[in-house]
Amino acid sequence: MTAQIIDGKLISQTVRSEVGARVKARVEAGLRAPGLAVVLVGQDPASQVYVGSKRRACEEVGFVSKSYDLPTTTSESELLNLIDELNQDPEIDGILVQLPLPAGMDSTKILEHIDPEKDVDGFHPYNVGRLSQRIPKLRSCTPKGIITLLDRYNIQVRGMHAVVVGASNIVGRPMTLELLLAGCTTTTCHRFTKDLESHIRQADLVVVAVGKPNFIPGEWIKEGAVVVDVGINRLDSGKLIGDVEYDVAKTKASYITPVPGGVGPMTVATLIENTLLACEQYHSK
């Protein structure tokens, strides 16, 4: 078996085009365009790249994009004050604070300070809680993006045994909640999991998000399983690879996401989708 490649670039562009069309229709109807505030603290090179891609996506779909590039010396109270201002700004529907924040800043405190109705990253405990209660509003971008990929490829996950490897607040935990909501029997594996291999070998759907190159050997993948690789790891050679041994896994899986070009583009597309959703649901009065 050779796996069908799940093309995240293609699907993300489709999602962005759909959002762009809805924004155009809003503006033509006399409504304002959605607004996204992107806050970057410090000079982290990877964060600058991510923020750049988010800002470009905003412009592409016709959003109002407001950028706040703050120096590393910014205090926590100054950042909280900025968030207060953005929470009150009627032209801003979404607030994104790029992680990681500089040392000394309490990221939990800062993310919780964002108005849940403008939390387009889906990190606020209110929004994660809604997902856990099966009444989601703004959903965490990477897990929601993965669900979109599975839906667009008509992969029926209800009843599948899904294994999520990684239990971070950003991907692993909300991914588990998304898969429960989708009707999967879901196992979450983490650093204390015993006999990881046995869990992977039983999985109909595997989602891996640990940030370790080739962490999951391809031979562990069950014949016909669906493999979603969230990892993005840069080797010394400069090559980007995922958390799953791709070349072997693709000979066993029915569907697989490549790295790059799989999950990554969906994160930004979902952020854009969430911002439009926040505008339509909460701020179009």
Curated annotation (Swiss-Prot):
Pathway: One-carbon metabolism; tetrahydrofolate interconversion. It comes from the Bacteria. GO terms for biological process: L-histidine biosynthetic process; methionine biosynthetic process; purine nucleotide biosynthetic process; tetrahydrofolate interconversion. Keywords: Amino-acid biosynthesis, Histidine biosynthesis, Hydrolase, Methionine biosynthesis, Multifunctional enzyme, NADP, One-carbon metabolism, Oxidoreductase, Purine biosynthesis. One of its GO terms (cellular component) is cytosol. Gene3D superfamilies: Leucine Dehydrogenase, chain A, domain 1, NAD(P)-binding Rossmann-like Domain. It catalyses: (6R)-5,10-methylene-5,6,7,8-tetrahydrofolate + NADP(+) = (6R)-5,10-methenyltetrahydrofolate + NADPH; (6R)-5,10-methenyltetrahydrofolate + H2O = (6R)-10-formyltetrahydrofolate + H(+). InterPro entries: Aminoacid_DH-like_N_sf, NAD(P)-bd_dom_sf, THF_DH/CycHdrlase, THF_DH/CycHdrlase_cat_dom, THF_DH/CycHdrlase_CS, THF_DH/CycHdrlase_NAD-bd_dom. Its EC number is 1.5.1.5, 3.5.4.9. GO terms for molecular function: methenyltetrahydrofolate cyclohydrolase activity; methylenetetrahydrofolate dehydrogenase (NADP+) activity. NADP(+) binds at residues 166-168, 232. Homodimer. Belongs to the tetrahydrofolate dehydrogenase/cyclohydrolase family. Catalyzes the oxidation of 5,10-methylenetetrahydrofolate to 5,10-methenyltetrahydrofolate and then the hydrolysis of 5,10-methenyltetrahydrofolate to 10-formyltetrahydrofolate. PANTHER family: C-1-TETRAHYDROFOLATE SYNTHASE, CYTOPLASMIC (PTHR48099:SF5), C-1-TETRAHYDROFOLATE SYNTHASE, CYTOPLASMIC-RELATED (PTHR48099). This is Bifunctional protein FolD. It comes from Aliivibrio fischeri (strain ATCC 700601 / ES114) (Vibrio fischeri).
